[in-house]
């Protein structure tokens, strides 16, 4: 159980925020909130609430339920605790987009980096409302790309390490 260590980190974050001249509006966790044990979400949230500001969350592969029926059902624990797996919000003049690019393929721990068509359509609509010149921050768990060699050759052995359909995503 890593909650005692998390408690320590949360206290450090709270101390830093109190001592800072900056105005921290929220924190952003980029996934793997808990290590497969979704029953500790409530305790995790209680600890993190001591930081003095709200957190927004991105779903990670460890936040999904494996051995389930489908990709859609793999997200239920996360959605029941935190809400939708993809959403957007504005803070000041910045538009934040959170996406789920963990695509669980219905077998063991196997997932790929992939953004499904529903999210791509939603993303197109969301971006259509944003005035040109607005700063946009996109957050997702799996990197869109790792390095030049990744861009040159698609490798089945590392499909869980980067976004498989990044060309479609980059066109957005």
Where in this protein do the model-derived segments appear?
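Short acidic, glycine-rich surface-loop motifs adjacent to enzyme active sites
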Residues: 30, 130-149
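A short acidic (Asp/Glu
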Residues: 39, 148-151
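Active-site metal-binding loops of divalent metal-dependent hydrolases
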Residues: 1, 31-33, 61-62, 101-102, ...
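Short, active-site-adjacent cap segments at secondary-structure transitions
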Residues: 35-36, 64-65, 144-147
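N-terminal active-site segment of His-dependent metallophosphoesterases
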Residues: 1-42
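Extended active-site neighborhood of metal-dependent phosphoesterases/phosphodiesterases
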Residues: 38-135, 155-172
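Short amphipathic alpha-helical segments, especially helix-boundary/capping motifs
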Residues: 20-21, 98-100, 145-147
């Amino acid at each position: 159980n890593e909650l005692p260590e998390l408690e320590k980190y949360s206290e450090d974050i709270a101390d830093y925020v109190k001592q800072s001249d900056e105005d921290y509006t929220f924190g952003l966790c980029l996934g793997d909130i808990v290590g497969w044990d979704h029953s500790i979400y409530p305790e995790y949230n209680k600890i993190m609430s001591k930081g003095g500001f709200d957190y927004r969350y991105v779903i990670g592969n460890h936040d999904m339920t494996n051995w389930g029926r489908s990709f859609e059902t793999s997200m239920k624990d996360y959605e029941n605790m935190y809400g939708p797996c993809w959403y957007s919000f504005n803070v000041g003049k910045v538009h934040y987009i959170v996406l789920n690019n963990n695509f669980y393929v219905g077998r063991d721990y196997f997932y790929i980096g992939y953004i499904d068509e529903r999210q791509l359509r939603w993303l197109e609509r969301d971006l259509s409302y944003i005035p040109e010149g607005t700063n946009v921050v996109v957050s997702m768990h799996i990197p869109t790309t790792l390095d030049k060699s990744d861009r040159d050759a698609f490798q089945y052995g590392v499909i869980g390490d980067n976004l498989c359909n990044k060309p479609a995503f980059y066109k957005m």
